[in-house]
A protein has these predicted regions:
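Conserved N-terminal phosphate-binding loop of PLP-dependent enzymes in the Aspartate aminotransferase
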Residues: 1-144
Length: 144
């Protein structure tokens, strides 16, 4: 279904072209700016705190948060849990992809240039998606 149609994720942002090198250099310059680094720290803290609150709501479903700055892995109790959350996020306009090495884990990467108001909306949608995925799993278990 939907994962084969809409679930593709590309891996290389700057690979394979000279123009990619120019874009990569500009990206490094932007990432080195003090205001960018300051915002990354703010967003990372905010995202971590909000996700911890969501995890407290679903402790038996949303079982782990792995975080390094704005790169996160969200771990779910179901063997394919991240796929459920990924689909509900996608339906709510948020792109994240499950880990092919461990489909319990969702790769969640908000980005370094995220504005606080966008982060808040993204996290509201994430909380909704996690809740919907949890309800879906519970309904499947009851039906089985």
């Amino acid at each position: 279904g939907w994962l084969n149609e809409d679930g593709f994720g590309h891996i290389s942002t700057f690979g394979g072209a000279e123009l990619g090198c120019i874009a990569a250099l500009k990206t490094l310059e932007i990432c080195s700016r003090e205001e960018t680094r300051s915002m990354v720290h703010y967003i990372a803290d905010y995202v971590g705190q909000r996700l911890a609150a969501v995890q407290a709501t679903y402790p038996d479903w949303f079982v782990g948060i792995r975080q390094n700055g704005v790169i996160l892995g969200l771990e779910f109790a179901h063997p394919q849990g991240a796929k459920y959350v990924m689909r509900h996020l996608y339906e709510n306009g948020v792109w994240a992809i499950f880990s092919t090495l461990d489909p319990r884990v969702l790769q969640y990467k908000p980005g370094i240039l995220l504005k606080p108001e966008v982060a808040e909306e993204m996290l509201d949608r994430t909380e909704l998606a996690i809740g919907k995925a949890y309800a879906e799993i519970r309904n499947e278990r009851r039906s089985a």
